[in-house]
């Protein structure tokens, strides 16, 4: 959608993170209940690091991993990292076998009443804008809550 492509262009052009708001606006407080979409890739790690000032002040932080292999890790490596930095996070491993990754994210936003989604924007500049795919396109085209995104 146009909203998703415009959001991707903002992130890519800025060279830094961006806060993407739902097209209809958003009035409630942002950042009290944070959901981090985690897949263990560089972009997810960058988004987590860039959003740290918000994450550190949140009342609740939920880290959503699609599988134990996504480096949130069966050994809890990411969770221990967050705790060492003063953030007690709830690790959610939710493979959603009959859902797309975007549907799993949306379901967990509702389940945990999240008011901010933190996620990495995956891909390469021009190609990303042309074929903004999968999870990024779905989430950014109609975000139900504000989305903090980094590339």
List PLM regions with ranges.
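Intrinsically disordered or low-complexity boundary/linker segments at protein termini
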Residues: 1-60, 64-65, 142-151
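A generic structural signal for well-ordered alpha-helical segments
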Residues: 10-11, 82, 109, 140
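A short, terminal or domain-edge coil/loop segment
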Residues: 17-25, 74-75, 80, 115-125, ...
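Redox- and metal-dependent alpha/beta enzyme cores, enriched for Fe-S-associated oxidoreductases
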Residues: 40-92, 96, 103
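Short linear Ser/Thr-Pro motifs
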Residues: 41, 134-136
């Amino acid at each position: 959608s146009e909203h998703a492509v415009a959001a991707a262009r903002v992130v890519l052009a800025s060279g830094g993170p961006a806060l993407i708001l739902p097209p209809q606006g958003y009035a409630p407080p942002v950042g009290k209940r944070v959901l981090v979409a985690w897949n263990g890739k560089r972009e997810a790690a960058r988004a987590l690091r860039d959003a740290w000032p918000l994450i550190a002040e949140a009342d609740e932080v939920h880290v959503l991993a699609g599988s134990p292999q996504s480096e949130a890790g069966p050994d809890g490596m990411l969770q221990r990292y967050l705790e060492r930095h003063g953030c007690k996070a709830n690790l959610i491993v939710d493979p959603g076998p009959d859902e797309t990754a975007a549907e799993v994210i949306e379901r967990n936003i509702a389940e945990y009443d999240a008011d901010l989604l933190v996620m990495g924007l995956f891909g390469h500049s021009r190609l990303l804008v042309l074929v903004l795919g999968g999870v990024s396109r779905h989430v950014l085209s109609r975000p139900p809550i504000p989305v903090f995104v980094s590339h």
